[in-house]
């Protein structure tokens, strides 16, 4: 698996795994049949990314959901950063995605974990329209009913997003200035700063003019490249090894 490949320093294998992971996420999004995620307990990292790519999600109230990759020195690379960039663009007021994007950036960079399905909606891991059930015994029944309802109502997959406006280099610069202040105040480490910069670079669409239009593949490629750059660093590898051994994060 990914951890084994990393520990064996097989970065080429990791790169292939990430590409396949992204293809799977996109397959969930653009499947010709409806996809409904049934969440009970934990949906962390890649699990959360799969949930975000489904047409609907049904979650038990006490589910823990989040993109926690930054805690081990990485960033979401299964489409998680791309999804937040897309959400910011789709819900932008006056065509500017940055006001929303800066909140989404904090969610990802701080590895914020929703400790309930309601909080997952607040953090935009779940949609406002997603269903929350109180009893986990009802979960599969409700999820199946939603999938059947979508299928029976003439379901069509969403159109591919080919014109996503991004915050570009101005957005990156604004976030980077905030990261500099945090670093100078010793609130984050040098490696935290690097991780934050990589996340901002991806979510803002790279070094482009603000308002430039990109497609999902552009954002996914930025994700994959940034992930591979981080996973090749000694400090990220130390964080992963420490977490696998102790179950606790390492600040280095």
Where are these regions (language model features)?
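Gly-rich Lys/Arg/Thr-decorated short loops/hinges at beta-loop-alpha junctions or inter-strand turns
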Residues: 1-6
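Conserved catalytic cores of soluble enzyme domains
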Residues: 7, 11-18, 22-162
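Intrinsically disordered, low-complexity segments enriched in small/flexible residues
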Residues: 89-112, 116, 122, 128, ...
């Amino acid at each position: 698996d990914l951890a084994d490949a990393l520990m064996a320093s097989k970065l080429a294998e990791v790169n292939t795994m990430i590409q396949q992971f992204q293809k799977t996420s996109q397959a969930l999004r653009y499947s010709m049949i409806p996809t409904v995620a049934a969440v009970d307990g934990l949906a962390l990292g890649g699990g959360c990314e799969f949930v975000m790519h489904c047409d609907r999600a049904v979650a038990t109230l006490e589910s823990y959901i989040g993109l926690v990759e930054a805690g081990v020195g990485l960033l979401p690379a299964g489409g998680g950063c791309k999804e937040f960039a897309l959400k910011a663009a789709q819900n932008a007021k006056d065509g500017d995605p940055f006001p929303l994007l800066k909140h989404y950036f904090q969610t990802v960079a701080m590895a914020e974990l929703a400790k309930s399905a309601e909080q997952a909606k607040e953090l935009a891991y779940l949609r406002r329209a997603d269903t929350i059930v109180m009893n986990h015994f009802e979960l599969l029944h409700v999820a199946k009913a939603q999938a059947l309802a979508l299928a029976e109502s003439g379901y069509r997959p969403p159109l591919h997003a080919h014109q996503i406006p991004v915050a570009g280099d101005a957005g990156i610069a604004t976030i980077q200035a905030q990261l500099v202040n945090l670093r100078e105040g010793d609130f984050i480490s040098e490696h935290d700063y690097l991780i934050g910069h990589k996340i901002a670079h991806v979510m803002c669409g790279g070094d482009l003019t603000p308002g430039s239009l990109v497609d999902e593949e552009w954002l996914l490629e930025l994700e994959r490249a940034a992930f591979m750059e981080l996973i090749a660093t000694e400090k990220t590898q130390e964080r992963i090894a420490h977490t696998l051994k102790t179950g606790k994060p390492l600040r280095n």
